[in-house]
Amino acid sequence: MTDCRLYLITPPAFDPQAFAPTLAAALDAGDVACVQLRLKDAPDEAILRAVEVLRPLVQARDVAFILNDRPDLAARSGCDGVHVGQEDTPYREARRLVGADAIVGVTCHDSRHLAMVAGEEGADYVAFGAFFPTGTKEPKTTADPEILTWWQEMMEVPCVAIGGITVETAPLLVQAGADFLAVCGGVWNHPAGPAAAVADFNRVMRG
């Protein structure tokens, strides 16, 4: 199995210009596979403004820039892909909008069936969770780490673990077989700061 990698999710609300240096410092502190811009229920103008500010600094570091929920905006704003939930744009429509070469990831909660369907349809990754309590959003489901192990044994499509992940809880998910750890509060609210959090997560994921 390849090393687990960090998948950063932006805070629920922020000023793009003020947040940019913090994000840059976090990306420079260790390996990060991708950054997901998640501004739930924000107007299109706010989302596009955040993309305009953050996408260049993310992509300049060879890190993928993913937009949450909005394949239409992702396609027109130069994002590397989109992440869709079960109540968002269906996978096939998202793929049509962003194109064959873009990344499309799908939330599958704790459902093996949803994950199998997403994988068979062509999703670039599936996301399971929430594994731990989270203050970022109200989780619809609680997932058992065993689902990561099962997925690794069954499928080649990468899996992302999400939900309340901290430096302290990460080892369990790494050992269970997560390819990526999707982290929000565990980085941005880390006592020593986001850059220290990224460095700590990298140490944990390298064993």
Swiss-Prot record:
Residues that bind 4-amino-2-methyl-5-(diphosphooxymethyl)pyrimidine: Q36, L37, R38, L39, K40, N68, T107, K137
Protein encoded by which gene: thiE
Annotated cofactor note: Binds 1 Mg(2+) ion per subunit.
Family (UniProt): Belongs to the thiamine-phosphate synthase family.
GO MF terms, alphabetically ordered: magnesium ion binding; thiamine-phosphate diphosphorylase activity
Binding site for 2-[(2R,5Z)-2-carboxy-4-methylthiazol-5(2H)-ylidene]ethyl phosphate: T134, G135, T136, G164
Pathway(s) it belongs to: Cofactor biosynthesis; thiamine diphosphate biosynthesis; thiamine phosphate from 4-amino-2-methyl-5-diphosphomethylpyrimidine and 4-methyl-5-(2-phosphoethyl)-thiazole: step 1/1
Gene3D superfamilies linked to this entry: Aldolase class I
Name of the protein in question: Thiamine-phosphate synthase
InterPro entries according to UniProt: Aldolase_TIM, ThiamineP_synth_sf, ThiamineP_synth_TenI, TMP_synthase
Enzyme Commission code(s) on record: 2.5.1.3
Catalytic activity, reaction form: 2-[(2R,5Z)-2-carboxy-4-methylthiazol-5(2H)-ylidene]ethyl phosphate + 4-amino-2-methyl-5-(diphosphooxymethyl)pyrimidine + 2 H(+) = thiamine phosphate + CO2 + diphosphate; 2-(2-carboxy-4-methylthiazol-5-yl)ethyl phosphate + 4-amino-2-methyl-5-(diphosphooxymethyl)pyrimidine + 2 H(+) = thiamine phosphate + CO2 + diphosphate; 4-methyl-5-(2-phosphooxyethyl)-thiazole + 4-amino-2-methyl-5-(diphosphooxymethyl)pyrimidine + H(+) = thiamine phosphate + diphosphate
GO cellular component: cytoplasm
Chain residues that bind Mg(2+): D69, D88
Keyword set, alphabetical order: Magnesium, Metal-binding, Thiamine biosynthesis, Transferase
Source organism, top-level taxon: Bacteria
Protein's job: Condenses 4-methyl-5-(beta-hydroxyethyl)thiazole monophosphate (THZ-P) and 2-methyl-4-amino-5-hydroxymethyl pyrimidine pyrophosphate (HMP-PP) to form thiamine monophosphate (TMP).
GO BP, sorted A to Z: thiamine biosynthetic process; thiamine diphosphate biosynthetic process
Keyword Cell division: no
Higher taxonomy: Bacteria, Pseudomonadati, Pseudomonadota, Alphaproteobacteria, Rhodospirillales
Cofactor entry: Mg(2+)
